[in-house]
Amino acid sequence: NLYQFKNMIQCANKGSRSWLDYVNYGCYCGWGGSGTPVDELDRCCQTHDNCYDQAGKKGCFPKLTLYSWKCTGNVPTCNSKSGCKDFVCACDAEAAKCFAKAPYKKENFKIDTKTRC
C-alpha cells in the first residue's frame, strides 16, 4: 500500500530524502500523470504508474494492497508470494530502487504540468 511504498522509498534512499519530495515532482510523480517525463526520476514514476495500472487490470488494488517486505542493506525486498501482494510489492520495490538511483532536480519539483507535460 502507499504507506509501505513510502517506507520502501526511505529504505532505498537511506532516509536522505523525504517521500514528500517525490509528490508533485515532474509529470508523473504524485497523483495521475501525462505527457513526456521530464527526467530519469520522472520516468521512474511513469513506470510505477504503469505497473499500478497493470495491477489494476489483474484485479488488484495497488494503493491499498498490504504486502510483506524487508529492508536489508538499503534494498527493499519482497516476501509476499501471492498474486496481488507479490505484484504490487514488486512495483513499489522497483520504483523505490529507481528513485534512489535517479538524480533529483529541484527545478522539476512542483512544475507547471499544463505547460511542461
Curated annotation (Swiss-Prot):
UniProt tissue specificity: Expressed by the venom gland.
Which residues are named in the active-site annotation?
A: H48, D92
Q: Which UniProt keywords apply?
A: Calcium, Disulfide bond, Hydrolase, Lipid degradation, Lipid metabolism, Metal-binding, Secreted, Toxin
As its record notes, the protein acts as a catalyst of: a 1,2-diacyl-sn-glycero-3-phosphocholine + H2O = a 1-acyl-sn-glycero-3-phosphocholine + a fatty acid + H(+)
Please provide, in alphabetical order, the Gene Ontology terms of the cellular component aspect for this entry.
extracellular region
How is its cofactor bound, per UniProt? Binds 1 Ca(2+) ion.
| Enzyme class label | hydrolase
Alphabetical GO biological process terms: arachidonate secretion; lipid catabolic process; phospholipid metabolic process
Could you tell me which InterPro entries the record lists for this protein?
PLipase_A2 (IPR001211), PLipase_A2_Asp_AS (IPR033112), PLipase_A2_dom (IPR016090), PLipase_A2_dom_sf (IPR036444), PLipase_A2_His_AS (IPR033113)
State its location(s): Secreted
Binding-site residues for Ca(2+), renumbered to this chain: Y28, G30, G32, D49
Q: Which cofactor does it need?
A: Ca(2+)
List the cysteine pairs that form cystine.
C11-C71, C27-C117, C29-C45, C44-C98, C51-C91, C60-C84, C78-C89
**Which Pfam families does the record associate with it?**
Phospholip_A2_1 (PF00068)
Q: What is this protein called?
A: Basic phospholipase A2 pseudexin A chain
Query: Species name for this entry?
Result: Pseudechis porphyriacus (Red-bellied black snake)
